[in-house]
Design a protein with these regions (language model features):
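Activation on beta-sandwich/Ig-like modules and their edge loops
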Residues: 1-93, 98-132
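Conserved beta-structured recognition patch
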Residues: 83-190
Length: 201
């Protein structure tokens, strides 16, 4: 499957984030969201922060290319549930995974904090979990105040691999070191995932 990826995160008032489905999401699919940091030493999430589940309760599959918006109160424009927590305004993580908190299978990740490879994890720093790769299903913005970013271009007609690469490349994101990047400045997105051209034999 192609997974789901964050295309817009706003860590300043009002806290919001959007994801795009990169493959169809069957009805009753459950995806967990957390702003916990990942501890590379214990291969587990650090304590504190919030962990909550979103479920596709629409009665049908959500099509690839669909954008879903979540707010800090646990609301979603499709399905039910979400993070139900305010996102930090500096150095925040957001992970999407399936499975359990103690045995997660990661779908996508995002941080506006510090990525570390040694030392102790904090609320504003994280290891990158196995299964997540920068430029494929993880994006690290660096340590930015207010933690706001969005995919700059509005219209996308790309293969799945190209879509994943584009979304997770910081060169294709607009980031904010102030609280002025707001919902009103977000593009109206169109994500059309096209089939790869067949290889000529």
């Amino acid at each position: 499957g192609g997974g789901r990826s964050a295309i817009r995160v706003q860590g300043a008032t009002t806290d919001l984030y959007r994801i795009v489905a990169l493959n169809n999401i069957p009805n009753n699919t459950r995806i967990w969201f957390t702003d916990k940091s990942w501890d590379g030493g214990t291969l587990s999430f650090v304590s504190g922060e919030v962990n909550n589940v979103w479920t596709n309760t629409t009665g049908s599959a959500i099509a690839a290319g669909t954008v879903i918006q979540f707010d800090a109160l646990g609301g979603a424009t499709l399905g039910t549930g979400g993070l139900n927590s305010g996102l930090g305004s500096a150095g925040e993580q957001l992970f999407a995974y399936q499975g359990t908190l103690t045995s997660p299978t990661f779908v996508a990740g995002y941080t506006s904090g510090t990525v570390i490879t040694t030392g102790v994890t904090t609320s504003t720093s994280t290891y990158v979990p196995a299964g997540l790769t920068s430029g494929t299903n993880f994006v690290a913005l660096g340590d930015i105040t207010f933690g706001s970013s969005y995919v700059t271009a509005a219209i996308h007609n790309r293969s799945l691999a190209d879509m994943r690469s584009h979304i997770h490349n910081t060169a294709n994101l607009t980031t904010g070191n102030t609280s002025t990047i707001t919902n009103g400045s977000w593009p109206t997105y169109t994500f059309n995932i096209i089939s790869d051209e067949p290889t000529t034999q």
